[in-house]
Amino acid sequence: MEAHVKESTDTYCVIEMKIPYSGTFLNTEENIQHCLNEAGQLATSCALSQFDTDGSPIKVAKQRYTSKGLTGKYYQTPYGDFYLQRHVYQSSNGGATYCPLDHDAHIVVSSTPKFAKMVSSKYSRNASSDVQKDLSENHQRYVSRSYIQNVSQAVGEIIDSRPSWKYAIPISPTLVYFIAISLDGTCMLLCNDGGYRQAMVGSISLYASDGERLYTRYTAMPPEHGKNRFYETFIRDIKSVKKLYSQAKYIGVADGAADNWTFLKEYTQVQILDYFHACEYLTSVSNASFKNPIEGKAWLEEACHTLKHKENGAAELLNEMRTFLKKRIRDGKKETIQTAITYFENQMDRMNYESFCEKNMPIGSGVIEAACKVIIKQRMCLSGMKWTDTGAKTVLALRCLNESDTMWEQFWDKVTNIN
């Protein structure tokens, strides 16, 4: 070992190390990292030992526990693993043992908080094999894939067991004019012949009066029969935001699925159909109604402009589409036009885009569409991925915290302050 403890007290330690130069500069850099890792192991061991007791009896939940003596354990850190002797306790009635050091230092499985934070963050973004390779190549740390999964699972269980934790949003209420709530689903593959089923994701986005998006937080849940778990979690998040921003106008933005509006009506004052979904129907009408593609493209551009910028534009387009049914076109194309007509009829109250734009309200569901890709597809649908409910729930919880501004750091601040 090229590093050793020169001095250690209750408040600091001094590590001395010798770094050899070796061949190419790349090899020297590898030596530097190796020595720094050795120093990190020694420093972490010294710091961690400060959380141990002197072996005297203690009370846990008003029950007396006595030490069973020093017991050794390997601890995993960002710098490597080391073996440490610490006191383990048990009550006179037997049962589960208790380690004050593990509890007070907030050890996760056998990982220090920093390493658990590092591993679970990486695992939220990449498969365990990629995390393993990253740790080995970039940190000179080898851990098994199962350990990466177990630590991440333990972090996910902490998230799941603390639903009452409140997360601050770093945006002053005076800056927030609109809050858009959206939800959508996308498919992922389940284990045990579960096939492809729909996972749900929700977003809560804060907007300034000029329409600039200031902040977004996400909620997601793996496929389930019904959407009870997702709704329960999303409603809790919505209510926590409403307590912070009671003065804002709440807007529901979504595609045309009926169950979206059933949910959003209860929690928003204004409901807006995604403008771009409406334009997709206009595209279908254009293709079905015009033999000349140049004429069809010209009509589509004008129709999209009318829909967005003209008062009662949706109603005007609805009437125009009805006239297209009188054209001499194939029944299949008439069916396409009729589908668009029915869609516009059902969504008319949510298509006042001219008014919405004048007030700088968000009219597109791009945030939630992106969330389907970023929160779910980007990780859950990596090559060869199949998921159990527990594994999917863990990764989605980690991803939501990681992708929601400041929440990941807040979560770990709370973890390290659990009594």
Describe the residue ranges of each PLM region.
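An N-terminal low-complexity regulatory-tail signal and nearby short nucleic-acid-interaction modules
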Residues: 49, 53-108
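Catalytic center-proximal scaffold of phosphoryl-transfer enzymes
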Residues: 1-45, 88-419
